[in-house]
């Protein structure tokens, strides 16, 4: 009887190991596919050489990307990190790119996307969402911003649109709880200076460390948001102000 029980347990354990191995393999295969897709998109994004334009203008060819998928509204880049991705927006379909890649195919990684409540041209605060993927992929890189030393070496965020290149400087990094915590995602526009200051003060209050940067009402913001796993429904948020 004991031998039978032992064999049953061994069969179950082997079965669990095989199933686990399959899912690990499947996950790694999916990661590799998505890495290849984004490497391909980066090649499309590389601007064609034009001697009449300066190097900064050549950095990202938004028109080429738009020709492939006209849902693109920008390109997000943080130097010396893995964050170098297109940013999509579908105002009529909420979270469309949550589980879709740049080519609108199913993807666990999804694609960074601009909140449907934002207007790429006029919003005071551009709120961009992205998945927290292991190995610092997608917005998983933001996890490093919990440490002040990392922030000091990666202060600036570049954001390209169809018409211009913008640069932002980080002013706060914090975590909160979705739905019951600080509702930062409701602030795509500010009705008045008091509302703006309330938002900024709350961001700084929650920030992992103090960043001594002046910011004035009317200055544009960008917000990067991803999941944060130290708490249920956690969110990790990076706020930056426009400097160029």
Model-derived features with residue positions:
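N-terminal Sec-pathway targeting helices
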Residues: 1-13
């Amino acid at each position: 009887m004991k031998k039978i029980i032992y064999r049953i347990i061994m069969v179950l354990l082997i079965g669990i190991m095989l199933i686990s191995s399959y899912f690990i393999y499947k996950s790694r295969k999916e990661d590799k596919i998505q890495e290849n897709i984004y490497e391909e998109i980066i090649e499309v994004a590389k601007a064609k050489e034009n001697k009449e334009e300066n190097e900064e203008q050549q950095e990202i060819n938004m028109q080429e990307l738009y020709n492939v998928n006209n849902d693109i509204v920008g390109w997000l880049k943080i130097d010396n990190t893995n964050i170098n991705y297109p940013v999509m927006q579908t105002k009529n379909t909420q979270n469309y790119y949550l589980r879709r890649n740049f080519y609108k195919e199913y993807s666990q990684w999804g694609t960074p996307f601009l909140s449907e409540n934002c207007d790429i041209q006029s919003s005071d605060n551009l709120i961009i969402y992205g998945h927290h993927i292991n190995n610092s992929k997608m917005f998983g890189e933001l996890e490093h911003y919990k440490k002040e030393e990392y922030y000091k070496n990666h202060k600036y965020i570049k954001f390209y649109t169809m018409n211009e290149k913008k640069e932002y400087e980080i002013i706060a990094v914090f975590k909160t709880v979705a739905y019951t915590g600080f509702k930062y995602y409701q602030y795509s526009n500010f009705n008045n200076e008091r509302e703006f200051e309330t938002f900024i003060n709350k961001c700084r209050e929650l920030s992992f460390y103090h960043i001594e940067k002046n910011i004035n009402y009317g200055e544009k913001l960008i917000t990067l948001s991803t999941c944060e796993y130290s708490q249920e429904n956690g969110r990790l948020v990076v706020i930056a102000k426009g400097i160029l």
